[in-house]
A protein has these predicted regions:
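Terminal interaction-prone segments of large eukaryotic proteins
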Residues: 19, 111-295
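Domain-level detector for long, ordered catalytic/regulatory cores in large eukaryotic signaling
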Residues: 1-151, 155-158, 163-165
């Protein structure tokens, strides 16, 4: 990993910003009671691992970062979390799936009814481009929402509208409402410093109600949400360093790989297609400029 941390999140000290243990993630510990990683402690840990090759990892650290010689870089200070993976592809789909399963267990709606509701829902003009596929019965059985990173926020945002007739009967709907407020704040740009205490209170509340309503669904990303107040304080608005735009580029290359059906030297093939696309765009701009000049 680029920071020299362990790549496994289901054991040990999985967090890169504090020293919480995986077994303690379900405990109602205030964030102020959890030891924060510091530059000095991290450097000592790295030196201890280098001096003892038999240690595979220590406090979630597996070794020195490949970028340790880069001026101004340090794994503790230079690696903020990613809003897209923590919220949009992490906790949000889990909460939606948990609420739908709770509604089914309370006999408010069946799995088949959920699928039919999603298939018949009419999306608005601004949501049609990111219209998600319907949540099918097999997805509910597997506990996994099949959608892209752009489609999952659409499901999360429209969830109270699609299932408006029974959501207020769910005892755990408060989890969705608090998470929705947190998401609205972390997506804000510009982000005002006066909002940081509000975000901190919401994140602490979210942790408490998750322990109360969905204790088995507290994954490491649910803990990462608690640290967004510190993260935004240190790095600024979270949408300035999220991976959403990189995912868009990744989707383009996946489409090219599937459409060409060429599996020999795939990197060269992808680079060639992308360079041709860029050349076409640049030449098109030249023609547009010439056309304007002649006019």
């Amino acid at each position: 990993m680029i920071g020299g941390f362990q790549s496994c999140f289901n054991r040990g000290n999985f967090c890169r910003r504090c020293c919480i243990n995986y077994e303690d993630r379900n405990l109602p510990l205030p964030l102020s009671h959890i030891k924060v990683r510091t530059v000095v402690d991290h450097d000592k840990t790295v030196q201890e691992i280098k001096s003892n090759p038999n240690k595979s990892s220590l406090m979630g650290v597996v070794g020195e970062s490949p970028l340790h010689e880069l001026i101004g870089f340090h794994p503790i200070l230079s690696l903020p979390g990613d809003l897209m993976h923590d919220f949009i592809e992490g906790v949000c789909p889990i909460i939606i799936m948990s609420l739908l399963k709770q509604a089914s267990s309370m006999r408010l709606i069946t799995y088949a009814g959920i699928q039919k509701r999603m298939e018949n829902f009419k999306y608005g003009y601004f949501d049609t481009s990111d219209q998600p596929p319907p949540i099918q019965v097999k997805h509910l059985n597997n506990g996994h929402i099949v959608a892209t990173a752009a489609q999952k926020p659409c499901i999360f945002k429209l969830f109270p509208i699609i299932f408006h007739d029974f959501i207020y009967h769910l005892p755990s709907f408060i989890v969705y409402k608090v998470l929705r407020e947190i998401l609205d704040l972390v997506l804000s740009y510009p982000f005002r410093k006066q909002w940081l205490p509000v975000l901190e209170d919401l994140c602490n509340t979210f942790n408490q109600i998750m322990i109360l309503h969905f204790p088995t669904k507290i994954i490491p990303k649910a803990h990462f949400i608690r640290e967004y107040e510190r993260m935004i304080h240190d790095f600024g608005p979270s949408i300035k360093y999220w991976c959403f735009r990189y995912e868009a580029g990744h989707a383009y290359f996946k489409k090219i790989a599937m459409r060409t059906n060429n599996f020999k030297n795939t990197p060269k093939m992808l680079v060639t297609h992308y360079r041709l696309k860029q050349c076409f765009k640049f030449e098109l701009r030249k023609f547009e400029v010439l056309a304007l000049m002649h006019q």
